[in-house]
Amino acid sequence: ILIGLVFTFVIYLPMAFVQSPLQLGILRFLLGFGAGALMPSVNSLLSKITPKEGVSRIFAYAQMCSNLGMVTGPLVGSAIAGYISYRAAIVGTSLFVIVNIIWSFINFRKYLRKRSIME
């Protein structure tokens, strides 16, 4: 998860400084790899740390939060882009990813040196 988040941050930040649609397209393409790394990692982590009787509920919450983010993210981002600039919206997203990296590191640091979360 941390590697996926760091990769996502490293891709998001340069998006604020692109000079052409081609540059933005390439970075957006690369961003797909970050999302591709995050979703399976999160799902795997949820299935391992959740008690068996709560797995269906936690996956429902995860899906609900994901869908909520897919709606509110573009709404907030477009409002910021409209009132300030696209650059501000992208930098804001980068800052949000940094907060997520810090939060994930704090909450999962005890697992960083283990081969499996189940150890």
From Swiss-Prot:
The chain crosses the membrane at residues 1-20, 22-42, 64-84, 88-108. It comes from the Bacteria. The keyword Transport applies. PROSITE patterns: MFS. One of its GO terms (molecular function) is transmembrane transporter activity. Signal peptide: none annotated. This is Multi-drug resistance efflux pump PmrA homolog. It comes from Lactococcus lactis subsp. cremoris (Streptococcus cremoris). The lineage of its organism: Bacteria, Bacillati, Bacillota, Bacilli, Lactobacillales.
